[in-house]
């Protein structure tokens, strides 16, 4: 038997160690935003890129995971979600830039430390619906302050309807 959306959401809630009752905010925020995204996708008929903004620790990753779960299970939309942290340049690249421009570039988070070129190429592929092969997206590990090996990157094997960043 297929697991219910409510059960999946409760499991996800536990995985993020959320103790608060989400019923009120869930109905007002998560479901409504998911519905708006679904309707926008239907109207446009092409993949959507959803960007989440907020300070460190504000809940962007948690929000993205809840949206992904709802969009996939309630609306049957193929959804991918990654963190903006995953797009940081490698430690080696940041070190090289820090030697040329400014020592602050060694620290992730400084403007210019994200791989914007990669994102632009990926978004063009997604926008033009030319997603005809599997695609690797970097995965960053803050504990080592660097990208993980390619074997551990996000592996998108399908066209996506919604991409959350």
Regions found by a protein language model. Name each.
Residues 1-29:
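Charged, amphipathic alpha-helical linker segments immediately N-terminal to NTP-binding catalytic cores
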Residues 17-21, 80, 87-144:
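Conserved nucleotide-sensing/catalytic segment adjacent to the nucleotide-binding pocket
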Residues 31-43:
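Pre-Walker A adenine-sensing motif
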Residues 49-54:
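Short hydrophobic/aromatic beta-strand immediately N-terminal to the Walker A/P-loop
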Residues 57:
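Walker A (P-loop) phosphate-binding loop of P-loop NTPases
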Residues 60:
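Conserved lysine of the Walker
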Residues 63, 67:
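Hydrophobic positions on the alpha1 helix immediately C-terminal to the Walker A/P-loop
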Residues 69-80:
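Post-Walker A helix-loop "phosphate-sensing" segment adjacent to the P-loop in P-loop NTPases
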